[in-house]
Regions:
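Short, solvent-exposed loop/turn elements at domain surfaces
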Residues: 8-13, 24-26
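Proteins with a high burden of low-complexity, intrinsically disordered sequence enriched in S/T/G/P/A and R
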Residues: 1-2, 25
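Short loop segments at secondary-structure junctions
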Residues: 20-21, 95
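Beta-strand signatures of extracellular beta-sandwich domains
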Residues: 14-18
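Extracellular/periplasmic metallocenter environments
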Residues: 3-10, 49-95
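Extracytoplasmic beta-sandwich strand-turn segments characteristic of Greek-key/jelly-roll folds
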Residues: 22-69
């Protein structure tokens, strides 16, 4: 569950979980998102594992998915234009 606590009406966010933690995947998906406005800035890319809807300020979105069975680190980013470089984190899958 993600709550967008931003106060600016233009500050939408999402959470996009990626298939790995590689900089190449993060950059490719983040850059491709800028051309994916019709799909809420989530690009059609094999590097995308799951994604929330865009959350406007004050909104809460929930993502239900099956975590990868392979232990490792999986990046998540915000793909709203210009956000992915600073808005990212890591989900760790352990046994």
């Amino acid at each position: 569950t993600f709550e967008n606590t931003a106060t600016s009406a233009a500050m939408e966010h999402n959470v996009v979980l990626l298939t790995d933690n590689a900089d190449a995947t993060i950059n490719r998906v983040g850059q491709a998102a800028m051309s994916a406005a019709a799909n809420a800035y989530v690009p059609e890319d094999d590097g995308v594992l799951a994604a929330t809807d865009l959350a406007k300020p004050g909104e809460t979105v929930t993502l239900t998915f099956t975590a990868p069975s392979e232990p490792g680190e999986y990046a998540y980013i915000c793909t709203f234009p210009g956000h992915y470089a600073m808005m990212q984190g890591t989900m760790r899958v352990i046994q």
